[in-house]
């Protein structure tokens, strides 16, 4: 039987584009692990995607996951839009290249071993774990140490 994991993620960007951060809370039974990372030049959407990728990359085996995020962009992208993007060689319905393609490809790969139930939570509404992730993401953004490889200003 697969481990049942609950994951909460958030991304933050001060400026958009600007410095950004990710915040992650992973819960397995009674154990919680947190993660905060800061990036130099990036965007809020890239941080939302990167938070989920980083969280999934912490897992050592295939898991049953409930993943909570306040990002409609991430949730809709991975549960709806990505299928057509892949079919259309990573082109949006406008014919233009999909933004953040590098991270969408990484996220698509990161979800493969797992069964994931995607949950959207309203941001800044007092949801304990979402507020924790928001704070962790802001801490990361205030102390950037990493380059957001793949970020380009279009």
UniProtKB/Swiss-Prot annotation:
Cofactors named for this entry: Mg(2+)
Ranges of residues in domain RNase H type-1: 1-142
Annotated Mg(2+) 1 binding sites: 10, 48, 70
GO CC aspect terms: cytoplasm
EC supergroup of this enzyme: hydrolase
Keyword rRNA-binding found: no
List of residues binding Mg(2+) 2: 10, 134
Broad class of the protein's primary localization: cytoplasm
Sorted UniProt keywords: Cytoplasm, Endonuclease, Hydrolase, Magnesium, Metal-binding, Nuclease
Recorded superkingdom: Bacteria
Gene3D superfamilies xrefs: Ribonuclease H-like superfamily/Ribonuclease H
SUPFAM superfamilies assigned to the protein according to its UniProt record, in alphabetical order: Ribonuclease H-like (SSF53098)
EC number from the UniProt entry: 3.1.26.4
Family per record: Belongs to the RNase H family.
UniProt name for this protein: Ribonuclease H
Gene behind this protein: rnhA
């Amino acid at each position: 039987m697969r481990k049942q994991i609950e994951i909460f993620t958030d991304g933050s960007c001060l400026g958009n584009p600007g410095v950004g951060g990710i915040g992650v809370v992973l819960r397995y039974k009674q154990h919680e692990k947190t993660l905060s990372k800061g990036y130099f030049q990036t965007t809020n959407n890239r941080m939302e995607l990167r938070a989920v990728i980083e969280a999934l990359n912490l897992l050592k085996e295939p898991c049953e996951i409930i993943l909570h995020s306040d990002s409609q962009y991430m949730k809709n992208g991975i549960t709806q839009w990505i299928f057509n993007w892949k079919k259309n060689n990573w082109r949006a319905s406008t014919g233009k290249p999909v933004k953040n393609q590098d991270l969408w490809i990484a996220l698509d790969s990161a979800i493969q071993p797992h069964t994931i139930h995607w949950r959207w939570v309203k941001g800044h509404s007092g949801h304990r774990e979402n507020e924790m992730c928001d704070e962790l993401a802001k801490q990361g953004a205030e102390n950037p140490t990493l380059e957001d490889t793949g970020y380009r200003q279009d």
